[in-house]
Amino acid sequence: MRCKRVHRVGVLTAMLALLPLAGLVPSAWAQNPPPTPADKIQVSASTIEVMDSTQPQPVTLLSVTFRTSTPADLLIRFTGECALFTDVMSPDGNSKANVKVWVELDGVPVPVTSDPAQGGPDDGKVVFCNREVQLTSPDVIDLFLRTRESHAFQWGALNVGNQIHTLEVKAQLDVLVTGGGAAEAAVGKRVLIMEPVHLEHDAAF
């Protein structure tokens, strides 16, 4: 009986010693999860990205890192709120403003089409909102316009290799103001969805 008791205590002690180690494994994986093959990814944000004429550089709206297990094609969809603010003053004021959005895969812009017969490959930039206002009047007039609306677009990337990739959505304000006035833009709530697919062998974007 004495031997059996010692044996049971030894087993119980070993089990209790292993419990803290078992708890450490999920915690470590939670902090540094191993990259897994992407099935379908969605990222979103609600922070407002403001762009004005003093900021000529593009801004990054969303970013995600993923891994494809086998060579695949990607369908990339972006939806977001686009706002424009234009201020034009007489006697002869003009304001042009538009926001272009595009996606970059591993630092390279994804074209809308790569087919030379359709004008490709292009730079992948899409106009999400656009405005031109001209004011000509002998009277003193200050015209301020503020609008916001939602838009969406989809890109496609063919034959993406099986490795870790970074996908970014970027935007830039193009503005031209003459006379008195100003122009600004903002992107609000936005969603990026990326889905690996296998299209037909002769598929083209």
Locate each region found by the language model.
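Bacterial N-terminal signal peptides that target proteins for export
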Residues: R2-M15
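Low-complexity repetitive segments in secreted/extracellular proteins
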Residues: R2, L21-W29
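Bacterial N-terminal signal peptides
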Residues: L12-L24
